[in-house]
Amino acid sequence: MNTVGTPLLWGGFAVVVVIMLSIDLLLQGRRGAHAMSMKQAAGWSILWVTLSLLFNAAFWWYLAETQGREVADPQALAFLTGYLIEKSLAVDNVFVWLMLFSYFSVPPALQRRVLVYGVLGAIVLRTIMIFAGTWLITQFEWLLYVFGAFLLFTGVKMALAKEDESGIGEKPMVRWLRGHLRMTDTIENEHFFVRKNGLLYATPLLLVLIMVEFSDVIFAVDSIPAIFAVTTDPFIVLTSNLFAILGLRAMYFLLSGVAERFSMLKYGLAVILVFIGIKMLIVDFYHIPIAISLGVVFGILTITLVINTWVNHQRDKKLRAQ
């Protein structure tokens, strides 16, 4: 696998992730099960974004010093583009978590505990998926066309799909788990397992955790190929992806109270997926520069947010008129 990642870069990335996760877990342990406030969520979100940008700046500086700016500039731009794509697509993941927690009636104080383990599991699963995907692409380059067609299909499907939490209980995964696990009827505080009459029971909280992990794998199948459209360097794909999902938990609590205000966002994300899919399909005929890709993704998100703001304004105006 061709990569700009050196032992120093890999080691530096690992140290940053381990330190930040340790601090996060330590604070979680001291405070116990409680909901993250909007102020805390905003603070952690800003911290993760700032840390990601600082890492990219350090990454650029290291490459500029060791290999020159002709290498550093496009690689740092690839990281930024991959990070923006993953961060954008992660919002849809957050909305699915909202539906899961609502359907299973998980109180806010326990949602944070589930998401701690959910993000840790996502780090492991995505790392495996990224290295496996990179290896497959190096062996079978035609897979990029498969990924492109898949993203094109997914984008159209996302735009047309209707989100409905009422059908969660009928999902094959949920039905299978309920049929094969000895499970309590109600959530037992913050426990994933409890003992009753000498028998070990799973709790609905474990079911929610498994569904959170499962939903992340499903979204990773979309987002990881999307970053492969920008670069196939495993270091950039992994670091941009993980930095984006490390801030997912804070993003969840930041958006959980205002999710209904982002009704148009899924259409913007759908357009991004369609654009990336087309980019991958036409790569042999026309190579879209990374800077153009970054501009297009940023432009789509900006236009979507402007339209979303206008829609909310019109809706609020109608409500006030009633």
Curated annotation (Swiss-Prot):
Regions of this protein lying in the Periplasmic compartment: 1-6, 65-89, 135, 220-225, 283-286
Main location as per UniProt: membrane
Record keywords, A-Z: Cell inner membrane, Cell membrane, Membrane, Transmembrane, Transmembrane helix
Transmembrane domains' residue ranges: 7-27, 44-64, 90-110, 114-134, 136-156, 199-219, 226-246, 262-282, 287-307
Any single Pfam family the record assigns to this protein: TerC
UniProt cross-references to InterPro entries, sorted A to Z: Integral_membrane_TerC, Integral_membrane_TerC_rswitch
Cytoplasmic side: 28-43, 111-113, 157-198, 247-261, 308-321
Record membrane topology: Multi-pass membrane protein
GO CC, one annotated term: plasma membrane
Sequence similarity: Belongs to the TerC family.
Role of this protein: Has been proposed to be a redox modulator.
Record-given protein name: Putative membrane-bound redox modulator Alx
Species this protein is from: Salmonella typhi
Organismal lineage: Bacteria, Pseudomonadati, Pseudomonadota, Gammaproteobacteria, Enterobacterales
Gene name of this polypeptide: alx
